[in-house]
């Protein structure tokens, strides 16, 4: 006869893993979750603290080795993601912290302000002209008002 091996289905195995990661009353300090809730600590640092607590409990037989491997792999991935985010943030700051040339130089802006008011044929300064044409396409005449 063929020896029958009972393989656990994936959902049951996942449920066992989740139950294995619950805070156990023996060995895990119960005051840590309430201590962390009062502080303004980023989520990644909370996970890192919890993972460091789990790794401190390696000697206990209650925590299976696959749970420890899972915690270690998640912690390592988080560390890599944080390093990548830090590099992206540094590049972003470097790009926008460089001094940029002003779009209008001082001489050009003085010329632009001198030409802002429109003079009519008699040389009298009239009202300022519109920079854009009206939407209906009509031209603006000074004599309308």
Swiss-Prot record:
<dbReference type="GO" id="GO:0005576">
    <property type="term" value="C:extracellular region"/>
</dbReference>
<keyword id="KW-0964">Secreted</keyword>
<dbReference type="InterPro" id="IPR043253">
    <property type="entry name" value="NmS"/>
</dbReference>
<feature type="propeptide">
    <location>
        <begin position="28"/>
        <end position="89"/>
    </location>
</feature>
<keyword id="KW-0027">Amidation</keyword>
<comment type="similarity">
    <text>Belongs to the NmU family.</text>
</comment>
<feature type="propeptide">
    <location>
        <begin position="92"/>
        <end position="117"/>
    </location>
</feature>
<keyword id="KW-0165">Cleavage on pair of basic residues</keyword>
<protein>
    <recommendedName>
        <fullName>Neuromedin-S</fullName>
    </recommendedName>
</protein>
<feature type="signal peptide">
    <location>
        <begin position="1"/>
        <end position="27"/>
    </location>
</feature>
<dbReference type="InterPro" id="IPR018070">
    <property type="entry name" value="Neuromedin-U_amidation-site"/>
</dbReference>
<feature type="propeptide">
    <location>
        <begin position="140"/>
        <end position="145"/>
    </location>
</feature>
<feature type="modified residue" description="Asparagine amide">
    <location>
        <position position="136"/>
    </location>
</feature>
<keyword id="KW-0732">Signal</keyword>
């Amino acid at each position: 006869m063929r020896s029958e091996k009972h393989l656990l289905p994936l959902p049951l195995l996942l449920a066992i893993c989740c139950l294995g990661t619950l805070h156990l009353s023996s060995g895990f300090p119960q005051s840590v979750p309430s201590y962390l809730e009062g502080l303004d600590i980023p989520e990644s640092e909370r996970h890192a603290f919890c993972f460091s607590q789990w790794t401190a409990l390696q000697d206990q037989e209650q925590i299976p080795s696959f749970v420890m491997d899972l915690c270690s792999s998640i912690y390592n991935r988080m560390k890599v993601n944080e390093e990548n985010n830090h590099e992206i943030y540094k590049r972003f700051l470097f790009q926008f912290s460089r001094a940029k040339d002003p779009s209008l130089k001082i001489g050009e802006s003085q010329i632009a302000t001198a030409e802002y008011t429109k003079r009519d044929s008699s040389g009298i300064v009239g009202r300022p002209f519109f920079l854009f044409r009206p939407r209906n396409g009509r031209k603006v005449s000074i004599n309308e008002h």
